[in-house]
Amino acid sequence: AALARACPSWNDDLWLVDSTPVECGRSRETVKRSDLAGWATYGYCASHSRFFWGLRLHLITTPSGLPVAYALAGAKTDERDTALDMISLNPELHRPGQTLMADKGYRRASFETELTDAGITLIRPTLGKEKPRPHQQFLRPFRQIIESVNQTLKAQLDLERHGGRTKPGVCARILQRLLALTAAIWHNETSDRPGSARSLTTYDH
């Protein structure tokens, strides 16, 4: 958290929220014997059109990709409840005037009401017969950012091959990835490197 706060983008007034699968095992025997049973559960990954056994990493980031809050939860845990918990349980995120950008999975009247009460404006896609919501033109580029952050964690930081077999082990290994991403963003932002702040190309050796 201290390193994230040292990044210039920490104070950005726009947040992006999303979750991504963290698989913890594939074989039936692993599921039966794993110390993660009860925390890890079966869930569905829409982007890969398949079920998985494991957790979901919930992230709130800035547009630069800087993680400002995270949570590891069971694969079926409600994304909206988790997002509210991440914000309400972290005093540093009590920032009236923030804007939170989310996908259609975060649609729920009570979710938006709680955000509004906290002074946070929700931007999400217009669904069905809803009255057109504002700022729809910004959704696509910012959705690409959060998806790019998830891809960085998976492709370059091996999130899906974390190798954790116990709760402390999984938490430590996921935190390693988030810390590595945060450190790269801090270095890129404070050294004025050209290009994306979340780029890890310089550190690929």
Language-model segments: which ranges?
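Short alpha-helical elements
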Residues: 1-205
